[in-house]
């Protein structure tokens, strides 16, 4: 394929631009890049062609070297790798300092980096990054210049066919050589602890990094390598080093994806997938690859993929840990696997693996280059922190040490016991446990509380990368017989008080369940160092198998409760007592009231799962075969279906096979057994309280949206939610609004300002708005009397608020009505606040309701009107919709100028932001895994989030009092296929799938596939197909679809919601009346957002 080559000198540093000139003279037709064509041929990009492309870029971005040297210019462009590197090198040739920025960064993150580097100019693709550009323009600050990047056709006019005799004009040479410590390139950190930080690379760094073993080492590696590095992002330090530096210094070819932008400069580049990475390797003949571990985890169990990897000379990974199970399996299959280590802060200091490493399966171990000076800081056990020191031949990009120049990595390594010079990374000095959800648990405080037990000698929490944490406990005096389940249970009970105390001081995701307490073995005590402190890494390594086994038990949910002491008998009275004990323990020690909803007493889905599993484990511990068989009849949603102890005891007793369930007569005849009666009972309870409140507060005149001074003061609940964030941004930008009180619940995990900022960044809203003086955050408990506020704050609200927008509400379609009583109570408290206003007129009260409040409407009666319905049967169905109906009735009867806004499905915002946990993104992700999309005979009246927000504000700030009820749904709905087909097409295009992929099937067929995958589903199955968790919801959708198929009706919303009348709403809201239909552009935004957030 390639002609002979001449290597640049390796005995002295040589700069990137000098390397280009060297190859232009010595290796003009050696291919720096190759990519496959549609006809299975290859296109080669020679050093001659690439160097000329770099010069063409320089001519375009800075003609005749006009202007000032050293200008910092950001490069934000989602384009082909070939073009990206040519532009970056061309900018350097033109004495421009490029700042490579990931196009996935949020607008505030980009703004932060621009400000920190005094960068006011951006090279980009305006039509592709329109939302980013408009967002940056909207932030104010220094004026920014946006310049379109050169196109592939401009830079490579003879793509793959450039010859030396073709016309070409070199770019003028620089008058002076840049200083060694001048910055030649900016990269940035990942932003895992805040906004990404700019990282400057000087010319000295460039010279030294080109000589690093992780780059120069490819030069003489045997066998000769062709590098399949197409999947690396070019703006990342790894992509920059591997795709540009390595071929330049090692004279080696890199295989890329075929560029897509030659004929259409706005076309997106190929998105790497597990399939197209391997396909590109096969087509280009590349024999070396470097990828992130997630791809290897996908390939490890695919025979065809493993066969491809076996034929590679080197399979390298970096960027994160690879599980031992996967790595060992690949090595056992004959894959030449090895790890590479490096970061933007210090480059690529490790060597490529040698023959000994590959032949002995030492894939986790690495060897640092001889030129790399490391200070290994012993941690008191077998681990060492790696600290890289600056030398005359190795300059760090970042230096963070006080006593010497260098970079402390915080990475912990261990030495290989027999192979001198080999090291393995095993963790961080910062032992914060990052869960699979991304939530972070700080163990120190919880470990300290548990250690205070007289029965405990040592405590180490674990759970990094898992769904929940656990704790390893060493008993103080007598050892526990680990073969005796009763002894284990007794010890757990002895230390439970301290564990419970630790849980009370921790966020919900950090709490430790009794089943997650692992006890040390007498023959494997905890490792200790220094003054007797535990050595965490060494101990956790020793208990690796036991910890893995514990998580496997958790994953196999039907086995988890086996260590729970069962009830003495399976009667209702005994079960009530036993279940109450279990529930109290799972609710963090809160004494559970038997006839009150568990989810109103601190339960969540994880607690419900553990309680169900304890029931199953208790049944299976009995010798009675009939009782053991009954364990298989425990439904998945048992606790959701029976959400208090009395109902649960009755249901379990029936399943256990008791001849006559001893059901309390009051419960049997209560409203909980009659859905309509249940709604009316809860409504009656709070209506009675409301009547007493109205008598106490007296009368007011009809309200308007503003005070006498004409200024509006708004109390907004739920501002940190999806819709709430758009409402808050709109209110803060509105000049009519003088002040906004954002009332949100308290959270142990973070302050409300932090949560609000994170939501704004995710939705690319203007974070600067959150610094306005007109915004006041309030953390409160709306369910408590006076909303749990102190007298001063409460009075301040009574004396100033003119509009209340109540948006906060729990969203969970699995829960029964009783679980939403705290939300109903919170609505009552807010109504009470409004009625106690000291203003001349009471505040205008807007309740954000849902079309779900009409879920029981008889379709034969036509469309659902914009009126308050007094017949509770219209709301019979899910607890969510029923609770919204009750709140509607409460605010209507309050005497306030109150309006209930029944919202339909809220779609993604301007940047496509659509919460990943919502049912529709879950359907899309699951469809990708199932290989089919469901078709439904119904329509959708979805509205983009920012339009919903605007419509609500139209009503909130209307001059005249709006009516009691309005339906805020899209007045021009579209059919399900008109939405889902563009979504499916966008997924196929973004994932580079064959056009015939992901066919449509009937909803019932799709649900049947889902049910098959749900049987014996593991944690990994549920991660890939999250629709399993909403199986009942999707079954209901399929049931409605079958009814519609039989009747031929098409005038029903997806999910069975009837058509909603919107005439009144349209007359008040110009936003609603002027709304365009959703379509292909919206679908593309949603899919782009989901992919950027890692949904699939």
From Swiss-Prot:
Residues 39-352 are annotated as: Adenylation (A) domain. Pfam families: AMP-binding (PF00501), AMP-binding_C_3 (PF23562), NAD_binding_4 (PF07993). PROSITE patterns: AMP_BINDING, CARRIER. AMP binds at residues 236, 339-340, 344, 425-428. It is an enzyme of class 1 (oxidoreductase). Residues 716-952 are annotated as: Reductase (R) domain. NADP(+) binds at residues 720-723, 807-809, 880, 884. It comes from the Eukaryota. Its EC number is 1.2.1.-. The modification O-(pantetheine 4'-phosphoryl)serine is found at residue 605. Keywords: ATP-binding, NADP, Nucleotide-binding, Oxidoreductase, Phosphopantetheine, Phosphoprotein. The keyword Phosphoprotein applies. InterPro entries: Adenylate-forming_Reductase, AMP-binding_CS, AMP-dep_synth/lig_dom, ANL_N_sf, Far_NAD-bd, NAD(P)-bd_dom_sf. Contains three distinct domains: an adenylation (A) domain that activates the substrate amino acid which is subsequently covalently linked as a thioester (aminoacyl-S-PCP) to the 4'-phosphopantetheine prosthetic group of the second domain, the peptidyl carrier protein (PCP) domain, as well as a reductase (R) domain of the short-chain dehydrogenase/reductase (SDR) type. Adenylate-forming reductase, a natural product biosynthesis enzyme that resembles non-ribosomal peptide synthetases, yet serves to modify one substrate, rather than to condense two or more building blocks. The A-domain preferentially accepts L-threonine as substrate. The natural product of the enzyme is not yet known. This is Adenylate-forming reductase Nps9. It comes from Serpula lacrymans var. lacrymans (strain S7.9) (Dry rot fungus). The lineage of its organism: Eukaryota, Fungi, Dikarya, Basidiomycota, Agaricomycotina.
């Amino acid at each position: 394929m390639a002609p002979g080559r001449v290597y640049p000198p390796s005995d002295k540093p040589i700069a990137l631009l000098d390397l280009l000139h060297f190859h232009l003279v010595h290796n003009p037709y050696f291919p720096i890049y190759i990519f496959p064509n549609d006809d299975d041929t290859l296109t080669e990009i020679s050093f001659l062609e690439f160097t000329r492309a770099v010069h063409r870029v320089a001519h375009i971005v800075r003609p005749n070297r006009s202007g000032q040297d050293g200008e910092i210019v950001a490069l934000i462009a989602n384009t082909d790798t070939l073009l990206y590197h040519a532009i970056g090198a061309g900018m350097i040739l033109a004495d421009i300092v490029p700042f490579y920025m990931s196009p996935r960064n949020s607008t505030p993150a980009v703004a932060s980096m621009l400000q920190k580097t005094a960068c006011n100019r951006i090279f980009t693709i305006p039509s592709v990054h329109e939302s980013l550009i408009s967002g940056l323009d909207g932030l104010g600050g220094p004026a920014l210049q946006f310049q379109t990047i050169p196109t592939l056709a401009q830079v490579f006019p003879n793509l793959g066919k450039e010859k030396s005799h073709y016309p070409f004009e070199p770019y003028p040479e620089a008058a002076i050589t840049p200083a060694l410590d001048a910055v030649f390139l900016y990269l940035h950190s990942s932003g895992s602890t805040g906004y990404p930080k700019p990282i400057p690379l000087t010319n000295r760094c460039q010279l030294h990094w080109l000589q690093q073993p992780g780059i120069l080492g490819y030069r003489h590696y045997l066998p000769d390598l062709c590098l399949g590095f197409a999947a690396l992002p070019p703006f990342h330090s790894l992509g920059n080093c591997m795709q540009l530096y390595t071929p330049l210094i090692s004279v080696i070819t890199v295989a890329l994806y075929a560029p897509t932008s030659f004929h259409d400069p706005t076309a997106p580049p190929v998105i790497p997938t597990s399939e197209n990475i391997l396909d590109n390797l096969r087509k280009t003949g590349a024999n070396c690859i470097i990828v992130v571990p997630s791809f290897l985890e996908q390939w490890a169990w695919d025979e065809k993929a493993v066969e491809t990897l076996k034929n590679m000379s080197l399979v390298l990974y970096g960027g994160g840990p690879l599980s031992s199970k996967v790595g060992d399996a690949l090595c056992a299959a004959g894959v030449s696997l090895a790890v590479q280590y490096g970061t933007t802060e210090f480059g690529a200091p490790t060597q490529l693996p040698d023959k000994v490493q590959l032949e002995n399966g030492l894939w986790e171990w690495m060897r640092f280059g001889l030129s790399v000076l490391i200070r290994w800081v012993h941690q008191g056990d077998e681990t060492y922190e790696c600290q890289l020191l600056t030398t005359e031949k190795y300059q760090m990009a970042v230096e963070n040490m006080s006593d010497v120049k260098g970079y402390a990595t915080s990475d912990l390594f261990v030495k290989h016991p027999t192979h001198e010079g080999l090291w393995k990374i095993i963790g961080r000095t910062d032992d914060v446990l990052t869960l699979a959800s991304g939530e972070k648990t700080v163990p120190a405080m919880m470990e300290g509380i548990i250690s205070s037990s007289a029965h405990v000698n040592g405590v180490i929490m674990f759970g990094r990368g898992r769904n929940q944490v656990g704790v390893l406990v060493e008993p103080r005096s007598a050892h526990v017989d680990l073969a005796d389940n009763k002894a284990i249970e007794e010890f757990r009970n002895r230390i439970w008080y301290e564990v419970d105390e630790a849980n009370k001081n921790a966020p919900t995701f950090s709490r430790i369940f009794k089943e997650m307490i692992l006890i040390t073995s007498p023959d494997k005590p905890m490792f200790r160092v220094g003054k007797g402190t535990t050595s965490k890494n060494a101990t956790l390594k020793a208990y690796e198998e036991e910890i893995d086994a514990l998580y496997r038990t958790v994953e196999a949910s039907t086995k988890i409760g086996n260590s729970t002491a069962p009830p003495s008998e399976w009667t209702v009275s005994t079960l009530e007592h036993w279940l109450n004990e279990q529930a109290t323990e799972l609710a963090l020690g809160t004494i559970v009231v038997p006839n009150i909803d568990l989810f109103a007493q601190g339960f969540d889905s994880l607690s419900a799962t553990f309680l169900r599993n304890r029931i199953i484990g208790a049944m299976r511990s009995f010798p009675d075969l009939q009782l053991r068989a009954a364990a298989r009849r425990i439904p998945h949603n048992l606790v959701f279906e029976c959400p208090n102890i009395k109902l649960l005891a009755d249901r379990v007793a029936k399943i256990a096979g008791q001849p006559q369930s001893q059901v309390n007569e009051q419960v049997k005849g209560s409203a909980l057994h009659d859905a309509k009666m249940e709604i009316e009972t809860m409504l009656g309870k709070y209506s009675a309280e409301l009547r007493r409140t109205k008598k106490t507060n007296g009368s007011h005149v009809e309200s308007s949206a503003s005070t006498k001074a004409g200024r509006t003061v708004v109390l907004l609940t739920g501002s940190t939610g999806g819709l709430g964030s758009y409402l808050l941004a709109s209110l803060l930008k509105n000049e009519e609004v003088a002040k906004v009180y954002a009332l949100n619940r308290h959270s142990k995990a973070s302050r409300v300002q932090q949560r609000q900022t994170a939501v704004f960044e995710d939705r690319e809203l203007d974070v600067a708005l959150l610094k306005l003086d007109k915004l006041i955050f309030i953390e409160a408990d709306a369910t408590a009397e006076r909303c749990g506020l102190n007298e001063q704050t409460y009075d301040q609200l009574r004396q100033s608020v003119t509009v209340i927008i109540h948006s906060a509400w729990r969203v969970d379609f699995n829960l029964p009505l009783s679980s939403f009583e705290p939300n109903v109570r919170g609505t009552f408290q807010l109504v009470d606040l409004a009625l106690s206003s000291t203003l001349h007129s009471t505040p205008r009260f807007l309740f954000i309701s849902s079309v779900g409040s009409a879920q029981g409407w008889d379709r034969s009666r036509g469309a659902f009107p914009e009126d308050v319905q007094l017949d509770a049967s219209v709301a019979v169905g899910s607890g969510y919709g029923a609770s919204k109906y009750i709140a509607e009735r409460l605010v209507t009867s309050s005497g306030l100028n109150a309006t209930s806004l029944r919202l339909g499905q809220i779609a993604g915002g301007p940047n496509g932001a659509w919460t990943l946990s919502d049912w529709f993104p879950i359907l899309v992700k699951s469809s990708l895994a199932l290989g089919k999309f469901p078709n439904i005979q119904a329509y959708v009246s979805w509205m983009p989030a920012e339009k919903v927000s605007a419509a609500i504000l139209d009503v909130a700030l209307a001059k005249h009092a709006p009516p009691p009820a309005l339906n805020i749904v899209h007045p021009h709905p579209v059919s399900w296929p008109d939405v889902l087909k563009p979504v499916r097409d966008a997924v196929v295009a973004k994932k580079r799938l064959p056009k015939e992929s992901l066919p449509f099937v009937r909803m019932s067929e799709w649900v049947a596939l889902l049910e098959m995958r749900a049987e014996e589903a593991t944690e990994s199955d549920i991660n890939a197909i999250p629709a399993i968790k909403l199986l009942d919801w999707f079954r209901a959708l399929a049931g409605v679809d079958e009814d519609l198929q039989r009747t031929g009706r098409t005038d029903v919303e997806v999910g069975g919601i009837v058509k909603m009348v919107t005439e009144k709403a349209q007359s008040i809201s110009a936003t609603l009346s002027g709304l365009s239909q959703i379509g292909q552009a919206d679908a593309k935004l949603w899919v782009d957002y989901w992919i950027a957030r890692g949904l699939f």
